[in-house]
């Protein structure tokens, strides 16, 4: 998820071409908000600092994916315990502020969440801490709901698409 200098440069070239293409395509596109991501949409400070946000365009938003704390939120073999705000969450938003927000560049967390490990209460506490920290910095966040809630792997599902209800209403209420 960190990549190397060459990979990060390819992403920068892609972002530049993307912005130029959208802006030149007519219609409302010169005024449309569009998003760019660091390499792998990674929340690593190294990748955020390497992102070259196109200059002179106040409608560019940086989108980052951040599943934190990793061992709790994304690592399926990791811990199912979460009891208090984790330093990785505060570090993320401090980094976002220093790298982007302080320079007038808006950021959205395009993906966040925590996998289902039969630990709803811990997930509720984590989402409350995550979102309250994000709110302090004015960063909106989108829970990644991939429709899966049980089994091995990345189970982020909240919405029961078949029956039209919530698998974990407590988490939805916390959001």
Identify what each model region corresponds to.
Residues 71-89, 163:
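Acidic/histidine-rich helix-loop elements
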């Amino acid at each position: 998820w960190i990549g190397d200098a060459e990979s990060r440069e390819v992403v920068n070239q892609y972002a530049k071409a993307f912005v130029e293409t959208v802006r030149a395509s007519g219609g409302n596109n010169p005024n449309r908000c569009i998003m760019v991501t660091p390499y792998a949409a990674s929340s690593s400070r190294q990748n955020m600092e390497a992102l070259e946000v196109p200059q002179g365009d106040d409608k560019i938003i940086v989108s980052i994916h951040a599943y934190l704390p990793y061992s709790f939120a994304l690592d399926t073999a990791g811990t199912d315990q979460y009891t208090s705000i984790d330093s990785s969450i505060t570090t993320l938003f401090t980094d976002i502020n220093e790298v982007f927000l302080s320079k007038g560049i808006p950021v959205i967390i395009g993906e966040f969440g925590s996998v289902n490990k039969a630990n709803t209460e811990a997930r509720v506490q984590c989402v409350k801490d995550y979102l309250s920290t994000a709110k302090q910095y004015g960063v909106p966040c989108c829970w990644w709901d991939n429709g899966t809630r049980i089994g091995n792997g990345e189970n982020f599902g909240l919405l029961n698409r078949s029956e039209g209800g919530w698998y974990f209403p407590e988490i939805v209420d916390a959001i």
